[in-house]
Amino acid sequence: MGSYVISDIHGCYDELIRMLEKINLEDSDTLICAGDYVDKGPKNAEVLEWIMNVPPNVILLRGNHDEDFAQNIEAMRIISYKMDLDRDSLQDTKTLYRSMKKLAKKDASVKFDRCETVYELIESGYTFSRLCAW
């Protein structure tokens, strides 16, 4: 029965899997993931898919990058109510994203998708409803 802590995955899925293989996590072990799952790395989509399917012995905490990501999605949700969008349409998701980027350019105080994680996920095929599931 071991306890492990990892953090700052930042979209580095391959490295995450190598770490998990190295510790050989068993059902009796506890793994605490201390946040910052997304941004910077090349495989944010894969890391998010892993998060959505973790076993019960894995505790997930949000980091500042995850909070920023969640705020980006919430901002998109607010704007989406003003638009006639199909949340399951990739094209409508791209339209919503472009609208958000335009809004952010108009107001320097608005920070939206600075690391382009949302953009990467949309380009990987994530629709707005799938983004909201996270």
Regions found by a protein language model. Name each.
Residues 1-50:
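N-terminal active-site segment of His-dependent metallophosphoesterases
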Residues 45-48, 53-134:
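Active-site neighborhood of divalent metal-dependent phosphoester bond hydrolases
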